[in-house]
Every structure is written in C-alpha cells, then in structure tokens.
Amino acid sequence: MSMLLGVRGTRDQSSYIGGRDYVFWQKEMRDAERIPGPTPLPVVGNLFDIDLEHVLQSVIGLANKYGPLFQITINGEKQIFATSQALVDELCDESRFHKAVASGLENLRMLAHDGLFTAYHGERGWGIAHRILVPAFGPLRIQSMFDDMGDLAQQLCLKWARQGASNSINITDDFTRLTLDTIALCTMDFRLNSFYNNDTMHPFVESMLYVLREADVQSALPGIANSVRIMAHRRMLKNIEAMRTIARDIIHDRRKKENPADDLLNTLLNGRDPVTGEGMSDESIIDNVITFLVAGHETTSGLLSFTFYYLVQHPDILKKAQKEVDETVGQAQISVQHLAELPYIDAILKESLRMMPTAPGFTVTPKKAETLGGKWLLNAGQPINVLLPACLRDRSIFGPNADEFSPGRMLAENFSKLPPNSWKPFGNGERSCIGRAFAWQEAQLVVAMILQNFDLVPDDPSYTLRIKETLTIKPDGFRVRATLRHRQTATGLFQHTLSARNDTSLASSSAHFIKKSEDQAPAGGRPICFFYGSNSGTCKALAHRLASDLMPYGFTDQKLAVLDTAVDNLPRDQPVIILTTTYDGQPTDDAKKFVAWLESGKVPALQGISYAVFGCGHHDWTQTFYRIPTLIDELMHKAGATRLAPRGTANAAVSDLFSDLEAWEETSLLPALRETFLLSSSSDLEPLNLHQLQISLSKPRRIDLHKDLMEARVTTVRILTNPDTPEKRHIEFRFQGDTTLRPGDHVNVLPVNPPSTVLRVLAQFNLAPDYSITINSFNTLGLPQATPVSASELFSAYVELSQPATRNNLRILAATAQSDEDKQELIHLQDSYDSLVRDKRVSVLDLLEQFPSVSLPIAAFISMLPALRLRTYSLSLAPSFKPSHGSLTFSVVNEPARNGNRRYLGVGSNYLASLTPGSILYLSPRPAKEAFHLPVDQSRIPIIMICAGSGLAPFLSFIQDRMIWQQQDKPLARALLFFGCGGRFLDDLYHEELSEFEAAGVVDVRRAYSKVLDYDMARGCKYVQDRLVAEANAIRHLWAQDATIYVCGSADMAKGVEGVLEKLLGMLPRERYVTEIYQMQTRDNVSEWLI
C-alpha cells in the first residue's frame, strides 16, 4: 500500500511558468486554500501518523478525519491524497492529468523497467508494447481463452472436492495458485502446475511476494534507512533475477516449439508496432512477461478472495447467487455464453471491488499547474494519489450504507446511473488495466463454478477481516470449508470437459473470417465499401463477417480498410458500412484521423454518400458507451450523407457480437440495401449465406493442407478379438522419417470418412464419385481453393460428415424446407437441440435424409461442414523395442446409431481398419503429458498400470521398454499390470506377448474378465476395480515404495478405479497418480485420448 507513500516527484513532466501566466499563477497561489492534513514533525514528518504494517488503514483513517483532499509529509516530500468522487472525476481528465510512476511502483522498475504497468508517461517502449498488445486482449481473443480458464478452475474445484468438507481451505493461497496458473496457460501456453505443489507456492510467487513487499517497505522508509539495508537490497536483487530467469525460461521454451500457440506470448515475440514497424526487444519481452504474470494474477486472486469473504459473511446473498447459477446453468457445463446471463454474479464482483479494490490506488500528476476542486492549487509534476478505498465509499455517491456490502447497487440499471468516474478499480484512461476483460471473465467463471458445485461456510465463524498489504491487498488468515452440492462425489465431478462453445466458436469464427484478403476480392459484382476502427481486431472480424454475408446479394466487388483511409475518400457510388468502437472514450488508433476530420468542420459536403454504422461497446463504460459510433453517425448525417439504416449496436458485456451483427443485418441493413440499391428478387431468395461457395467441375487432387504430417507405411495388421465380441485391431507401420517418441506418446492420424457415409452424400446430391469440384470462395473454410478435386475425395478426405449439426445449421435447413411440416419439425429441433440433436449426434447429412423437402444447395452443405480433424491414438510399440516403427491398438466403432436404424461408424477406427500392408497413412508424432511417461529411475520406482480394453496400448509400450532395460542388465523395480476385458478367448489382448514378458520378470499381470467370471486367471473378478481390491496388499506394498500409478481407459472405468484406490491408499497425489481418459463421448473412436 505504500505505493502511495514516499513519492519523490516524477520524471514525466517538468513545467516552466513565465510571463503573463506567471502573474495569474501568483494570484492563484494567493487565493488557493491550504491542503489540510496532520502537522508534520521535524525530520520524520508524519511517519508516526502511519502504521507501516497497516498503511492502508492508517491513510483511510486520515481521509475520514481531514476530508476529500489531504496531505502528509513522508521522507521530506508532501503526499497528496484525493478521496472523493468529485475530485477523482477531475483527476481522471486525461487532458489535464496523466499517470505518475512513483514510490513503490517506481521501485518495481528494477524488476519490470518500462513494462506496461511501470513505464513512465510517454516512454517510447510503453507505446510500442501497448500498440502491439492491445489486439491480444480483444473480446474474441479473451473468449477463446475460456476453455483453458475452465481447465484450471476445474483443478481448483477437484482439489477442494477431494480434500473433503472438513478441510480448512486457505482460500487466498488457492486463488493465487489458480490465477497465476491461468495467466501463464492462457497467455503463454505454459503450465506452472501450482496445484500439484500443495505445500509450497511456485518459486515465481515466492520471489514476487518478497519483491512486492520490499518495494513497499523501501518506499515508506527514509533514504538513509534504505541505504543501510544492504542484505535486504541484495535479497531483492536475487529474487528479481529469479523472476526474470523464469520469464526467460518461458520465452526459451516457446522459441523451441515448431508450432507455437497464437497467444499473447506469440504476440510479444513476433508482433510489430503498427506505427513504427518495430518489434519488441528481448528485454522488453521479459519485462512484459513479468508484468503479466504479476499483474495478471495478483489483483484477481485478491478480488476472488474478498468476494468469497463477503459471500460467506452474507449467506442470503450467497444463496441468491447460487440460485442465479442454478437457474441459468443448472448442473450443465458452464459455457462462455452463460457468463453474460449471470448479472447478479457480475454485480457481486463489482461490489466486492468497490468495498475492497485490490489495487487500492493510482497516481496522477498535472500536465501544468491546475486548480483542483476550485480551491486547491497543484503544481505541474506534483503526484496526487487517488485513494480508491475512500473514493469508492463516498457517501454522496453510494449513500449512507456505503460501508455495507450490497450487490444490488451494482446491477446494470443502477450502475449506469452512477456519476462519471465513480468506480475506477482498474485505473484510468490509456494507462488503465489492459487485461480487465481477461480478469473479469476469469473471475465470473470461477465464482460461477464454485457456487454451482459447493456450499461454503467460514472455517472460523468469529473471523474478523484482516488485510494483508503489499502493493496490493488481500484478506489475511481467511479460511473456508467447502461441501459438494447436489449429492456429487469428488470422482463424479466434471465428467465432461468445459466448453467455451455452444454451437460455434466466436474466436474461431473471427479467425476464419479474418483470413480474407484486404486487397483482393471477387470482382464483377456490386461495389460496397467496409471501413472499420479496431484496436483489438473485433470490429475488423465483424467487418469481414458482414462482407462475407453480403456476397450472396451480389456485393462481390468489396473493399475492406481501416477508417483512417476514408479521410477525403468516401465513395459515392456504393454503400459505405462503418464498424467501430470506443477505446477509453476515444476513437481506436486506426480511426483517430477520420474522427478528427469529421470534427474539424472542414469536411466537404457528403451528399450522395450512403452509409450505415454498426458500433460495439461494453456497458460498464457508462459515460462513453457507443460514443464514437454515435459521433460518427451524427457527424456524417449532419454533413449531408444519407443514413441507410439506423445505427446497429452490440454490447460485449451481455451478448454474442456476431449474433447482434446478424440481427442488425437482417432487420435493418438488408431491407435498406434492397430498397436503395434495388436488389433483385433472385438475390432475395438467398438470405442465409447459401452460395458463398462457387462451384465448377474440374480435375481431382489429394490432401496436403495439414502441417507436420509425415508418411508411414503399414507393415502388419491383425484382428485381436473373437468374432463374437466388439472388434479390436492391431496395426503396425514404419515411419518414413525421424521421430523423438517415447513410450506412452501418441500420434495424430489423418483419416478419411467411411466409404458408405461418402456414398450417402453422393446419393443425396446426385453426384457421381468421379465428378470434379472446384471451390472458388472468398473464404477458405479450410478447403482447397481454385483446385479441382473429385466429389468422392472431397467428402472422404476434407470434411467431417458425422459432426452434429449446429443450431445455425438447423435454422438454415428450416428456412429452405419446402414442407411446412418439415419446417416446424426443424424449428422444434432447435428448441430441443441438446437432447434431440447434439446428444444423439444427428449430422446435417442425417437431417437432409430425414427431411427430404429441404432444398439445400451443395455449396451451402459444404460450407456447413467442419474440416476433417486429426485423430489421436496412443502408441502401443516402444521406439526402443522396434526402432523406426510404431503400432496402434484400437477398437473399431461400428454400432447402432443413437438417432435411427443406421450404423454409427467411427471415422478414425474404420479408416485404420481398412488399411492393409503396404498402405500409406499420414500422421504426426504427439508427446503425451510429461507425467504419463515411465519413471526416470526404473530401477527404484515401481509402477502400477491399470487399464481396460484398448487402454492397454500405452502400457504395452511401457512393458516393451522395460524389457529392453532388463536386456541391458539394468535392475528393474516391480511392475503390476491390471487389465480388464471380456474373457480369455474373447478379447484378452496380446495374451501370448504378455505371458512372455511375465516369464521374463518384466511385469506381473492381474486380469479381470467381465463375461467369463469362472476363469481362474481372473480369480472371479469382473472388473479391474474388483481385482484391485483383491490385490490390495500388493498395491499397498508398492505404494509404500513410492510407486507411480497409471490409469488408461474410459471415464467410467477411471472414476471407479480412483474410488477404489482412494479407499485403499487415501489421498492420491497427482504426481504419483496419472490418468489418460479416452473419449467415449464422441463415439467416434474409443482410442482417442483426452489429454
């Protein structure tokens, strides 16, 4: 908190007052009131008025005594504090004030130099980094991080569930682990795995806490005192170097990756400043990696901690919040769309930040001499501290109950009525928190998930809130107990992975449409111009989507460009569509010149220009909500341009931007275009984007669109099972290139669709298999462009034919149905989508066959289909056992479909089953998670392997590798394999091979037979869980010797195994209990892995 103390002036601004200005300044000095405050003592100033252990509480106490503006003297320097909304409103005027970096924050420059948080005002490195990084925090990019956020939130919930209802949870520590892991994974694709180190924090956190605390202490002590604290200074430098080393390691790890994630770290490494064209230096990259790791988790963990403190102190509010989650989400998986439907959760978080702003202040300084509040004179360069805990409890704004936790005051209808700058926990203006949307989405998700799954009570009902202060604040010593709701068990929690998508991915939609060329578009049609203003890429993505949507109406002669290029360049012979947003109350960087041009009054008459404006915004910025789109719309209309349609808007806080754009397009823009530009009736027949693909017949070609695929030649195939049981197969191949695989690793296989499914498509559209199709599209859709392929190859090798139809697919099919009965049934399917379509895996092809009156062009059908994806399989052959070779063990999925009389054919498994010796397949090696490998010291650490069916695959490679290890005369710790199947002569996979390995002493095999219970080899055990109980003593013996347990199989099997082992062994630490769950839910291939 002493970031607000010890200010020694700033380096940003100097001022010279001379001439007539000096005379006015002297008069203001005479008229100005003295800023109140306690009387300072000689030498020590007001040091004795401040409790250095509780600086925040001390300063708030002074605020209560001395009023909205007061000053104290620390280290010989005056410190000024503003504590009222009225003064903060003035201080947030960026035409008069800018950010000052001073005191504790300035001390952090040793750590992060000119990083986004610690840079001085106007520092060049900050400008470059800020312009490069803003697009990485656009709403679509943030939404794309939802799944990774959910992954880590699940880890937290699973930890609490497994520790049980009697466990006392240090909630602040766990939220610190969560938020640090989240920022590292979501922005840098780097797993810190903090939840697997239960007793200690990650070394980065340990070093960070010391550095933050020491920066705080240094800022509060006189310079002479700091000069003699030599050991503390050395320790601070040591911890700073430790943090920078971790950042370097993250960067080094990323640079080694051949196909890095397209995330914030990738932007740091490869981004270019749109103004200077420069990239960021290595030191600047390190500075900002550290900035994001610190700022990206520290305040969010505090927010979550204070939020749950207030919730458990107010059970009625907690229950109301749980009710909102239950009614909105139920027990389903939380999606990113749900977050906009939880307004009370949003209000709770806002109110928590009002009560306890975790970054308790920010500092500004006047650009020139200013009078504040009409009576206090401030010199240029004088830092003024905005004391948020006092400002956010200003009774003139929040009423006499300002000290009470009352989320209702933060609901949208009340929040929008607050005066300007009443709620500023994320800072101000261009130096406000760049990661606000990231932190908010994470906090909403975590609160919703915890309330969905747990009832919470304080561990100590008599606990009184204590504050732990560094440069941020958190509760000190606050603990809770968490009990699972809905009669859930720890093993039953999260049986389905979290999904950021309901029907479509906003982020992938954005990425898909953004591929369109800025400079090239199909010519020869109606002209249209799209101008966008976009810092984060969102409005650019919307412009591309809208351009794509309008192509079927003949608008194929398209221009897409940034708004600044429209200065004196607005065309008169075509529609002009403008899509933009407001950034900190101002135009986006690429729209500033255009807005300035409109505001200049020098705009020539715009008669003859037909335009429409679509604006994006977020309702939390109440004072500037849609400001720039509205301003552009009004100024263009005032200058004589013709408004084609009422302005469209999209509120990113509560809606899907693309859906809002689509609604405006259909209800406002298209009717206006029809009327003004006389669209033909033939265009009107295609309102649903059916003809984005333009098709002609030509010659065929083969697949080459996937990266990192290598060729492999099949050498051996065999069936492993009796004809009376579901088929399992073995396929062996030789790699046509070098690999670095280890036992337990995987390969991604590029399959083709089953021939019978392809024939259904050809029959549906009356195509011969050898027809040639050429796709000429303004959007790539992941398909070969302007290159002929045969119809059979296109539907075999490029697209998913069995993927469940989306709601949007159903909408299009309903719109093209000729029969009213079919139309109504398709609408009904939209209303019951989850149960009747998604869960039954009803594909677009299934629907076309079911509803023959649907008249869907083949181009529209192709555009509905996702690109064919790779399938992941676990290798069942150790590289050391047979170099340059690999093998797969898989179940062939051929079973009754859930939605009718047809058979459901797994794409990957049926493709592999069709291969014969000599066949070529394309695959890419994929390492397993690090924990799912053999121990480094196989001579000391025993292993226990547990699996069923084709889950044996990775363990076969483990055993083979152990065989090689033994043949090299190396000692081996004991290995136990528990294997479940139907019966000895049904599907006891690799029985002979395993018997040989057993005879060699490499492994001991313990079987369970589900269909032949009286066979002695299984000792009457039906499932592996039963065999585990029967072998309890052997398991406990190996567990006592530090054994590692590996589990591979279906989710149900793994859940049952975990339940048995927890009874036998107690708590299962993740580093010694490793699972791989194959994805039964897809019904595509039971050897596909969730890893």
Curated annotation (Swiss-Prot):
Binding-site residues, heme: 433
GO molecular function: aromatase activity; flavin adenine dinucleotide binding; FMN binding; heme binding; iron ion binding; NADPH-hemoprotein reductase activity
CDD domains from the UniProt entry: bifunctional_CYPOR, CYP120A1
Alphabetized Gene3D superfamilies for the sequence: 3.40.50.360, Cytochrome P450, NADPH-cytochrome p450 Reductase, Chain A, domain 3, Nucleotide-binding domain of ferredoxin-NADP reductase (FNR) module, Translation factors
GO cellular component labels: cytosol
Listed EC numbers: 1.14.14.1, 1.6.2.4
The entry's keywords: Electron transport, FAD, Flavoprotein, FMN, Heme, Iron, Metal-binding, Monooxygenase, NADP, Oxidoreductase, Transport
All copies of domain Flavodoxin-like, residue ranges: 528-669
Domain FAD-binding FR-type, first and last residues per copy: 707-935
Catalytic reaction list: 2 oxidized [cytochrome P450] + NADPH = 2 reduced [cytochrome P450] + NADP(+) + H(+); an organic molecule + reduced [NADPH--hemoprotein reductase] + O2 = an alcohol + oxidized [NADPH--hemoprotein reductase] + H2O + H(+); dodecanoate + reduced [NADPH--hemoprotein reductase] + O2 = 5-hydroxydodecanoate + oxidized [NADPH--hemoprotein reductase] + H2O + H(+); tetradecanoate + reduced [NADPH--hemoprotein reductase] + O2 = 7-hydroxytetradecanoate + oxidized [NADPH--hemoprotein reductase] + H2O + H(+)
Heme recorded as keyword: yes
Residues at which FMN binds: 534-538, 613-645
Keyword Transferase applies: no
Free-text remark on how the cofactor is bound: Binds 1 FAD.
UniProt cofactor(s): FAD; FMN; heme
Role according to the record: Self-sufficient cytochrome P450 monooxygenase that catalyzes the regioselective in-chain hydroxylation of alkanes, fatty alcohols, and fatty acids at the omega-7 position. Performs hydroxylation of C10-C16 n-alkanes and C12 and C14 fatty alcohols; and thereby enables the one step biocatalytic synthesis of rare alcohols such as 5-dodecanol and 7-tetradecanol. Converts 1-dodecanol into 1,5-dodecanediol as major product with very little sub-terminally hydroxylated products with the 1,4-dodecanediol and 1,6-dodecanediol more abundant.
Family assignment from sequence similarity: In the N-terminal section; belongs to the cytochrome P450 family.
Protein name from the UniProt record: Self-sufficient cytochrome P450 monooxygenase CYP505E1
Species whose genome carries this gene: Aspergillus niger (strain ATCC MYA-4892 / CBS 513.88 / FGSC A1513)
Primary gene name: CYP505E1
